Amino acid sequence: MESSTQTKPGSLIVVGTGIESIGQMTLQALSYIEAASKVFYCVIDPATEAFILTKNKNCVDLYQYYDNGKSRMDTYTQMAELMLKEVRNGLDVVGVFYGHPGVFVNPSHRALAIARSEGYQARMLPGVSAEDCLFADLCIDPSNPGCLTYEASDFLIRERPVNVHSHLILFQVGCVGIADFNFSGFDNSKFTILVDRLEQEYGPDHTVVHYIAAMMPHQDPVTDKFTIGQLREPEIAKRVGGVSTFYIPPKARKDINTDIIRLLEFLPAGKVPDKHTQIYPPNQWEPDVPTLPPYGQNEQAAITRLEAHAPPEEYQPLATSKAMTDVMTKLALDPKALAEYKADHRAFAQSVPDLTPQERAALELGDSWAIRCAMKNMPSSLLEAASQSVEEASMNGFPWVIVTGIVGVIGSVVSSA
């Protein structure tokens, strides 16, 4: 469906629908669902299922392969094989899974690996995962101060390490030690083993957030705050189900290494770094975080400078034609058009009417920087840098590209393989 180098008929594209019904499905995922020869889906809400069925009439619901007491791994093997069978029959297959199709999803990875090993085109497209929803709903940044993510049973079985100075996210906390499936939910009888481990690492008084992402647009997420010790209470423990996730905030901030700060030259000469990294805004779930004020001296000065702001010389405002906007949109959302373009950049670019000469040259080349130059009002200083970068790339074995002249946005671009 996408590559001109494919020699065997049949392909597999795996996409995600996000967690919240319909609205978190990407435009890219939707375009592949619409273009597929056959769609296999496993989603958790009927509105998303109904929406998928309006976009492609040749669909199979994979959820029917779950059963009470049946091994989930057996189900996953069957799901993968159902998709692979149609790929081997020469169809362009799309597998649709809720959330991100590669995050806590086994059959997608299995099917892709086997398809690739057999010589078929296979690709996974990103989607909105439950973890993405958690970051948004709890307003935490995984980069500050770092984040560990584990599956709860694996966390216990393999004694995965904990860094009490970073975020910890545990998935599938409502089915600890359970390998089969039950339509009525899981008997989470081994849950206290997980609580024991968390108490060992953090103590009974540390915060844990019981999180469930909203699955319908009219719902709010569950963000219940408890102590780890409270998880032993039956009334609280029974709230934890198959779609529950735990977020455990850092226990304390780690001291910075002042020697490394100096080596990296992060601070002006003579300035002494604080013992702790101060932040704003603070993490509402984290205790005792050294926090900066929202409007300190530096912030107030930066806001004052807005009054005299003028775009810098190297700022790049958009300056593109409707034809270029339309064709780039088509390449993003039409898998068949994308396949045609990848097969022959030059022929495809020549078939598009109303492009400027610069836009057509950039489209023929297919280089992201050249396309950016054509669509933006690119300053000459950046164009010269682009020219130098292209020249260096050609020396390293990339296709030979010569920027022969700079006229307007970009000059004529000559490319030969």
Curated annotation (Swiss-Prot):
Name of the gene: dbiMA
Protein's name according to its UniProt entry: Methyltransferase/ribosomally synthesized cyclic peptide dendrothelin A precursor dbihMA
Keywords of the record: Methylation, Methyltransferase, S-adenosyl-L-methionine, Transferase, Virulence
N-methylglycine, modified sites: G405, G408, G411
Lineage of origin: Eukaryota, Fungi, Dikarya, Basidiomycota, Agaricomycotina
InterPro entries, sorted: 4pyrrol_Mease, 4pyrrol_Methylase_sf, 4pyrrole_Mease_sub1
Active site: R72, Y76, Y98
Binding site for S-adenosyl-L-methionine: Y98, H100, V103, A130, Q172, A213, S244, T245
Family, similarity comment: In the N-terminal section; belongs to the precorrin methyltransferase family.
Region: Clasp domain, residue numbers: 252-378
Positions of the UniProt region annotated as Methyltransferase domain: 1-251
Species per Swiss-Prot/TrEMBL record: Dendrothele bispora (strain CBS 962.96)
Practical and industrial applications: Dendrothelin A displays slight activity against the plant-pathogenic nematode Meloidogyne incognita.
Region ranges (Precursor leader): 379-399
Pathway annotation: Mycotoxin biosynthesis
